[in-house]
Regions:
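Structural signature of tandem-repeat unit edges
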Residues: 25-31, 61-74, 88-106, 115-127, ...
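Consensus positions within tandem repeat domains that build extended binding/scaffold surfaces
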Residues: 108-111, 130-132, 151-154, 173-176, ...
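Flexible, charged surface loops at secondary-structure boundaries
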Residues: 13-22, 58-61, 231-233
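Surface-exposed intrinsically disordered loops and tails
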Residues: 88, 252-273
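Acidic Gly/Asp/Thr-rich repetitive segments characteristic of extracellular carbohydrate-active
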Residues: 2-20, 36-47
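A structural signal for leucine-rich repeat
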Residues: 81-82, 199-200, 221-231, 252-255
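Intrinsically disordered, low-complexity repeat and linker tracts
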Residues: 1-3, 278-280
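Extracellular beta-strand-rich solenoid/capping regions of secreted or surface-exposed proteins
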Residues: 37-51, 77-85
């Protein structure tokens, strides 16, 4: 891991960028703090056209930097947030084309909010806090084989994302995929606790794989505030659930769907291709 000071780290990254390098690899200490990440983002921000405003960067700018960070266990909140009122080095997020976090286990809230990257890989991340990748409108490739917990709206407004695999994910906050209008397939075979408006405005969905669902937040009693919302035609969606799935019932006092003791397999809901108030193209148990 680097023994550099923040100034030395900033200078090293700046030199690499000035030499025309676009593949930037940095090895940080496990406990690297926000000041070390700021040294990196301050250098990256200088590669972005200063005449472009925030709107132009978010909507139209294509990043050119492939960034790999190893060693560090946590990416601090708002590190690459593209917002001039939140992040001093806000242009750095627009510089990114791809991000690889080889050793990180936690990604802080809004860490990559509205960044320009198309590819994101974090093989050892266990938890991603709320809004961390929200608004990454060019993001198409995501590799998160170990993540177990996703906070609210982690992938909200990732308009280009078509498919995602979350093989170890158990807990999803509210609106994780809200407005992912190109999203076609979601594979989360261990997901048991789901938030409200999880798939709101995911109008391209064709297949969703979940685990043995135990709870689903619906916020209000209206199905409009449920997992899929009425904006989606769930009759075009193939739903896959665990063979251990139980029938769900709605608790109006808590605004949650909760699993009962009754097997879903062979139930009226199953026979009617229904789950938590929605009717699907098919409901398969595996």
């Amino acid at each position: 891991a680097t023994a550099m000071s923040t100034d030395e780290l900033n200078a090293a990254v700046t030199r690499a960028l000035a030499a025309g390098e676009t593949d930037i690899r940095i090895n940080l200490a496990e406990d690297a703090d926000a000041t070390m990440f700021s040294a990196i983002t301050a250098a990256l921000a200088t590669t972005v056209d200063p005449s472009l405003d925030q709107y132009e960067l978010v909507m139209n700018y294509s990043g050119t930097i492939d960034l790999t960070i190893s060693g560090a266990k946590t990416v601090p909140e708002c590190t690459f947030y593209v917002d001039e009122y939140v992040n001093e080095n806000w242009r750095a997020g627009a510089a990114l084309r791809s991000v690889t976090l080889t050793d990180a286990t936690t990604i802080g809230e809004s860490a990559f909010f509205s960044s320009a990257m198309t590819s994101f890989s974090a093989p050892n991340v266990i938890e991603i806090e709320g809004f961390a990748l929200e608004g990454c409108m060019k993001l198409t490739d995501v590799y998160l084989p170990s993540v177990q917990t996703l906070g609210d709206a982690v992938f909200s407004d990732c308009y280009a994302l078509k498919t995602i695999s979350l093989p170890e994910c158990i807990d999803l906050g509210n609106g994780v995929f809200n407005s992912c209008e190109a999203l076609e397939t979601v594979y989360a075979p261990k997901a048991t606790n789901l938030g409200a408006i999880e798939f709101m405005l995911c109008t391209s969905l064709t297949k969703v794989t979940l685990g043995s669902v135990q709870s689903v937040n619906q916020i209000y009693e209206s199905i409009d505030d449920g997992l899929f919302c009425l904006a989606n035609d769930t009759k075009n969606i193939e739903l896959v659930l665990s063979s251990e799935q139980k029938v769900m019932t709605f608790d109006s006092s808590t605004k949650y769907w909760k699993a009962t003791d009754t097997d879903y397999n062979g139930s009226d809901d199953h026979n009617n291709k229904s789950f938590i108030g929605y009717t699907f193209k098919s409901v398969t148990l595996q």
